[in-house]
Amino acid sequence: MNIVEQMKQKLKEEIKEAVIRSGVATEADVPSVILETPKDKAHGDYSTNVAMQLARVAKKAPRMIAEDIVRHFNGEAVFVKKVDIAGPGFINFYMDNRYLTELVPAILQAGDAYGETNVGQGQKVQVEFVSANPTGSLHLGHARGAAVGDSLCNILKKAGFDVTREYYINDAGNQIANLAKSVEARYFQALGIKKDMPEDGYFGEDIIELGKKLAEEHGDKFVALDEQERLQLFREYGLAFEMDKIKKDLADFRVTFDVWYSETSLYHNGKIDKALETLREKGHIYEQDGATWFRSTTFGDDKDRVLIKQDGTYTYLLPDIAYHQDKLERGFEKIINIWGADHHGYIPRMKAAIAALGYDPDVLEVEIIQLVSLYQNGEKVRMSKRTGKAVTLRDLMEEVGLDATRYFFAMRSSDTHLDFDMDLAVSQSNENPVYYAQYAHARVCSMLRQGEEQGWRYDGDLSFTYELAEKEIDLLKKLGEFPSAVAEAAVKRSPHRMTNYIFDLASALHSFYNAEKVLDAANVEKSRARLALMKAVQITLKNALALVGVHAPEKM
């Protein structure tokens, strides 16, 4: 708990004690005290409606209760310099903001650790995200999912969760069979042998490139192989080729994974048979019309689901059930799946499966990533200028830059459609939120360098003996909110709350800079204190930007 949270907690405790001392209510009847931050500063730094909450118990008008509480409130004990009552009984508290200066040395001491909280209490959480089919380049939906997923993992870890990042490789099923046939056709064509592409094949330049590469490296030695042996070989070549590309794109996007989990492994290690047997033993499987069905309606699904088709092949659902059973058996207390917008209808059947396996369905959380539209020059961008094909993650990174791509994908709630303005993303103006935030960091670093050139040290015995300016107080308060912002973004699974915080902190810094002088040769002690404040801003901004995968430049 940081200094601001400690102060708020002490204020809540003093309000509760004042209620008890006033005789308005006994300790057992005092509700949980809630502190709000008034939108209008004229109404104080904090406000509570506890008097209105107590009206029924005390059988008195809320305003009279508020007056009783205020009479018995000890403000000096909790840095309160003034209290007043507003409206029907709101109690407003005006803080003596000297306590805020204690934040600065605390942030300087914490450094990279500033913002860490223990709201997660070590809970084991698995976050599965991206999980794109290994049959082509990552598109914009995958890119947004990657940015949101990685940012969420960073935030959860900062908030005290034990996080595992996982990518599920869809390396079984028809799409991989079609990939193998596509590689085979391009290989034959590269050798000058006529071979038609499969009807549902993959026609991208990457498969043509792989076919040529195989022909150059191996000649025609695969032509004489048995077809099944050849297709198995091309399956492996194609899968490795596509996964290498995906891994490189994600690494360049600053997205990492702890586990790359192969769907095929579920078949080889008997986990699919195990999941099917578990459901059968629990009475949730039946046979009908030559197919094997999961009685998912028992658990709230709108209809029962086929697991094994009449021809003996599995539907997508069965390996997915086996995969989630494996997740749960690995001891994860919370499973967070980040899925594309087209998977929304899949959630009830997956929760039904988890319940049928004997687990709490609420262990599964699904965050839906809505679609992305690109705009340039006011027009919707449908194709990449470079390739003439659909825009990929790689295209976007090269067009607008890595930092802008990461920030823009994280700055809106993932369950809302995102209009990505490419012109805004590259503009060097205050309207560009990532430029605005990075410029704030660079501006602070510039001030720190200037202070260093003057030989003004800001560590050790800091002294904020002067009266704090209004914008300085605002900036200190915003610094103090960082751990709470991390905790809220983690608990609500909302990385966009962190970009909101970054924008607010950058705004507070720019406002302070425009209103106040940081470096003043006529007042070295004040300059030292404000340089320490700037260092605290630099640490906090850097830590916050890192959570959403964005670089904090020292110069711009």
Curated annotation (Swiss-Prot):
Its main location: cytoplasm. It comes from the Bacteria. A motif ('HIGH' region) lies at residues 132-142. One of its GO terms (cellular component) is cytoplasm. Its EC number is 6.1.1.19. InterPro entries: aa-tRNA-synth_I_CS, Arg-tRNA-ligase, Arg-tRNA-synth_N, Arg-tRNA-synth_N_sf, ArgRS_core, DALR_anticod-bd, Rossmann-like_a/b/a_fold, tRNAsynth_Ia_anticodon-bd. It holds the Pfam family tRNA-synt_1d. Keywords: Aminoacyl-tRNA synthetase, ATP-binding, Cytoplasm, Ligase, Nucleotide-binding, Protein biosynthesis. It catalyses: tRNA(Arg) + L-arginine + ATP = L-arginyl-tRNA(Arg) + AMP + diphosphate. One of its GO terms (molecular function) is ATP binding. It is found in: Cytoplasm. Belongs to the class-I aminoacyl-tRNA synthetase family. NCBIfam families: argS. Monomer. This is Arginine--tRNA ligase. It comes from Anoxybacillus flavithermus (strain DSM 21510 / WK1).
